[in-house]
UniProtKB/Swiss-Prot annotation:
Gene3D superfamilies per record: Nucleoside phosphorylase domain
Provenance organism: Geobacillus stearothermophilus
Binding site for phosphate: S29, H60, R80, F81, H82, A112, S211
Binding site for a purine D-ribonucleoside: E192, N234
Oligomeric form and interacting partners: Homotrimer.
Function: The purine nucleoside phosphorylases catalyze the phosphorolytic breakdown of the N-glycosidic bond in the beta-(deoxy)ribonucleoside molecules, with the formation of the corresponding free purine bases and pentose-1-phosphate. Cleaves guanosine, inosine, 2'-deoxyguanosine and 2'-deoxyinosine.
GO-annotated molecular function: purine-nucleoside phosphorylase activity
Reaction(s) catalysed (UniProt annotation): a purine D-ribonucleoside + phosphate = a purine nucleobase + alpha-D-ribose 1-phosphate; a purine 2'-deoxy-D-ribonucleoside + phosphate = a purine nucleobase + 2-deoxy-alpha-D-ribose 1-phosphate
Protein name per UniProt: Purine nucleoside phosphorylase 1
EC number(s) stated in the UniProt entry for this protein: 2.4.2.1
Enzyme class of the recorded protein, top EC level: transferase
Length: 274
């Protein structure tokens, strides 16, 4: 939680961006296409930004995109960092700290996730109502910098009730069926076993993945309002009698691309108005 490193990265970006972004977006596996919709786009590879890690996963482009989306000034992570890549939680969540330093107050996080709830189908979009941190760690462990947030942040509303309602209203308006449920984060990179999925279901999980929770914890610590959306890219282990592959994840996110774009763009449009 090095404030100097955060400020260096933010200063570098402030010199590139004409105004402060209002909304930050983090795009998960195969969902980076949203960044292509941004107008007056300024694209900056992660490797150019001081102190930024670099994404190593297929389906993650590895650049920050600033510009206009549906009437809002946004900054978008096209490709995120994962704990399983060998980064510390501090590095995984560093971009969220930088977004806050740039002036972002609202964050939309997206991911590809395995469906644990047996009523879900691949291609469903799920509004995250809450999460379970099953990663065995927390990005806030260590000394707390009170300039960045309080020592013991409240997580009773990790995902903004207001933004969840806004997203449900938007889905209704555009005629899109969306789910709502609890996202469980594991470290990965191995997919879960059928026994682990049964455990997650008993714990109250509806979808499972390997990201999002660290970023959300840090966003809440920083006082940001958060909306989370999972694309159910496959059914989790043991539900269907077939092995899981990353290719399947990318394939499903390709199919659901149009719905995802429509949904997130309409959400941003409504957030810009409110």
């Amino acid at each position: 939680m090095n404030r100097t490193a955060i400020e260096q990265a933010a200063q570098f970006l402030k010199e590139k961006f004409p105004t402060s972004p209002q909304i930050g977006l983090i795009l998960g596996s195969g969902l980076g296409v949203l960044a292509d919709e941004i107008e007056q786009a300024i694209k900056i590879p992660y490797s150019d930004i001081p102190n930024f890690p670099v994404s190593t996963v297929e389906g993650h482009a590895g650049q920050l995109v600033y510009g206009q989306l549906e009437g809002a000034t946004v900054v978008v992570m096209q490709g995120r960092f994962h704990y399983y890549e060998g980064y510390s939680f501090d590095k995984v969540t560093f971009p969220v700290r930088v977004m806050k330093a740039l002036g972002v107050e609202q964050l939309i996080v997206t991911n590809a996730a395995g469906g644990v709830n047996e009523s879900f189908e691949p291609g469903d979009l799920m509004i995250i109502s809450d999460h379970i941190n099953n990663m065995g760690g927390n990005p806030l462990i260590g000394p707390n910098d009170s300039a960045l947030g309080v020592r013991f942040p409240d997580m009773s509303e990790a995902y903004s009730k207001r933004l969840r309602q806004l997203a449900k209203d938007v889905a209704n308006d555009i005629g899109l069926r969306v789910r709502e449920g609890v996202y469980v984060a594991n470290t990965g990179p191995a997919y879960e076993t059928p026994a682990e999925i049964r455990m997650i279901r008993v714990m109250g999980g509806d979808a499972v993945g390997m990201s999002t929770v660290p970023e959300v914890i840090v966003a809440r610590h920083a006082g940001m309002e958060v909306l989370g959306i999972s694309c159910i890219s496959n059914m989790a282990a043991g539900i269907l009698d077939q092995p899981l592959t990353h290719d399947e994840v990318i394939e499903t996110t390709e199919k659901v691309k149009a719905d995802f774009l429509r949904f997130v763009k309409a959400i941003v449009r409504n957030m810009a108005k409110n």
